[in-house]
Amino acid sequence: MSRSDPGSGTMNQHLVVCGINYHFTPLAIREQFCIPDSCIGHALEALKRFPHIKESAILSTCNRTEVYAVVDDVRGGMADIEAFFASVQHVSDHEILKPNFKLLRDDVVLHLLRVAAGLDSMVLGEDRIMAQVKSAHQTALERQAAGPLLDFIFKLALSCGKKVRTETSMGRRAVSVSSAALELARTRLGSLAEKSVVVLGIGKMGQICVKHLLSEGGSGAVVLLNRNQERITAFLKSKLNNK
């Protein structure tokens, strides 16, 4: 198959996406599916071993963990992706934690375009998602998991996302869940300079929120609360090492 022609040889190839996202799944469950950036490459290698998966890419953020794939059989490919998710979960109850988001063919392309454009984000126009989609694309190429079809639709999505941000009002200022939360707090409470701020949870969004607070010097004491104390310790050590 020629890389310059994603449509060649696709008679028995089907585009699918399968996973979980914030529309259907609460945060506590999304955390069980989350694949750290450092593990994405290994996860792609695992996907290669499934018989029906011919191409794959993984987009894993705070709000979604989605496997984009080209499969030679829809039912078999979806079963392979579900088996993959069962193998990477951090708990054993696979009946409760099955992926509940699935799309086929053209709907996959439309979904990825919306994601990259920030139209499917928890905060409309979220700016970080473009970098996350780009990273998912690059890692899939580097691991030789993405072939011509996924390469094509990811490039299309990134181009669309860039165009939306340059030609509409969504690109006028940086937007994320963390920045929106801080903006809302300042709107309701006024200046945070003399106030203690409690950050509940030290996942990706919590860490970004803390970094915003520290870099801007925009609050008094910052208190971190998390179910896992070791995660707070690791985050604080990384902050100290980066100084």
What are the roles of these predicted feature ranges?
Residues S2-R3, G9-S121:
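A glycine-rich (often HGG/GG-containing) alpha/beta subdomain
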Residues H23, M122, I129, M205-Q207:
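Short, electropositive, low-hydrophobicity segments enriched in small/polar residues
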Residues E31, S169, G220:
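Conserved short-loop catalytic and cofactor-binding motifs
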Residues S38, H42, C62, G76, ...:
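Conserved active-site and cofactor/substrate-binding residues in soluble primary-metabolism enzymes
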Residues E45, A83, L110, A131-K134, ...:
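Solvent-exposed alpha-helical segments within well-ordered globular domains of core cellular machineries
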Residues I53, V91, K163, S219, ...:
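A general structural signal for well-ordered secondary-structure junctions
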Residues E95-L192:
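Glycine/serine-rich phosphate-binding loop and adjoining beta1-alpha1 elements at the start
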